[in-house]
Regions:
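A conserved acidic, glycine/proline-rich C-terminal tail/linker
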Residues: 225-261
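Flexible, charged surface loops at secondary-structure boundaries
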Residues: 47-53, 72, 169-170, 231-234, ...
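Short glycine/serine/threonine-rich phosphate/pyrophosphate-binding segments
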Residues: 63-67, 185
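ATP/NTP phosphate-donor binding region
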Residues: 1-58, 70, 90-117, 135-139
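A short, gly/pro- and small-residue-rich
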Residues: 68-82
Length: 277
């Protein structure tokens, strides 16, 4: 196997000690049959992920989500929590990090044996088409994706289409979320009752192509006029035509991708594998 280990570098003792343990384990169990490279998160580039059979991410959820933007859908990713809450209440929750130093040796041997469970994790991506006809995509988001006015104090204006439905809206931006990313932002962007009502829709149907969408700070009148355009659980593409002087798409709170008035932005899902023991 051609393996890349990417690690969080913050000079804290718990992370440095864990990294030394991880390296020791890999030297012992992978030295003969596998090639292993190590890179700190700050120095890694997209080219570093090319032709890898496995990417091991050592850190927390934020480390994994930021790196996932550089990883293609066919590359398996293994998350190792460098500071789990089981040993420290101030540690990382590690929703995506199924392994830790205590279990890493058994977990990685399971991967080497081809016996790991592979989860297909959906990721959100936006396709932007400019008024001049140029088309480009944003980095994929594991948790959520925001489409909004670059000036957050100004309203986000756009024409919204999903399936046969259409609506013109003025909101604080559209927040899209994967099923697994609902706890990152979506759940905190609405009231408890609103979130409960939205979750009721997921009980009837749930596929790998479904995602959440919420129009933030939408007026009561607009909510009543087009409930589907306020909050939804859908497997249909959502397309907006911007009526903002300048807007942006932000995947996972990371890089900003800007667009101008008249651009069309389509949000869609695709899946990527993640091995779990």
């Amino acid at each position: 196997m051609n393996i890349l280990v990417v690690y969080k570098k913050n000079f804290e003792e718990v992370h440095d000690g864990g990294l030394m343990s991880l390296k020791g384990i890999l030297q012992r169990v992978a030295a003969k049959e596998h090639h292993v490279d190590y890179k700190p998160r700050e120095h890694v580039r997209r080219a570093d992920f090319i032709a890898r059979d496995l990417v091991i991410v050592f850190g927390g959820d934020g480390t994994l989500t930021s790196l996932s933007h550089n990883i293609d859908p066919a590359t398996p990713v293994m998350g190792v929590n460098s500071h789990p809450r089981t040993s420290d209440p101030h540690g990382s929750y590690g929703f995506y990090m199924d392994s830790c130093i205590d279990t890493f040796e058994d977990d990685v041997n399971t991967v080497f044996a081809g016996e790991a469970i592979v989860n297909e994790l959906p990721r959100l991506q936006a396709l932007i088409e400019t008024t001049s006809g140029n088309r480009f995509t944003t980095d994929p988001a594991m948790n959520d994706l925001l489409i909004a006015n670059t000036h957050q104090y100004a309203p986000s204006k756009y024409h919204l289409r999903r399936g046969e439905n259409q609506a013109s809206q003025q909101s604080s931006g559209l927040l899209f979320s994967t099923w697994f990313g609902q706890g990152a932002w979506l759940r905190n962007a609405m009231s408890h009752d609103e979130f409960g009502a939205l979750m009721q829709r997921t009980t009837t149907v749930r596929t790998d192509q479904h995602y959440f969408v919420l129009a933030r700070d939408l007026s009561p009148e607009q909510r009543a006029e087009a409930p589907w355009a306020w909050m939804d659980w859908t497997d249909e593409e959502t397309t907006i035509t911007s009526d903002m002087h300048r807007g942006y798409v932000v995947p996972d709170g990371w890089d900003e991708v800007h667009f101008n008035r008249g651009a069309t932005i389509t949000c869609l899902l695709y899946t990527s594998p993640s091995p779990r023991d």
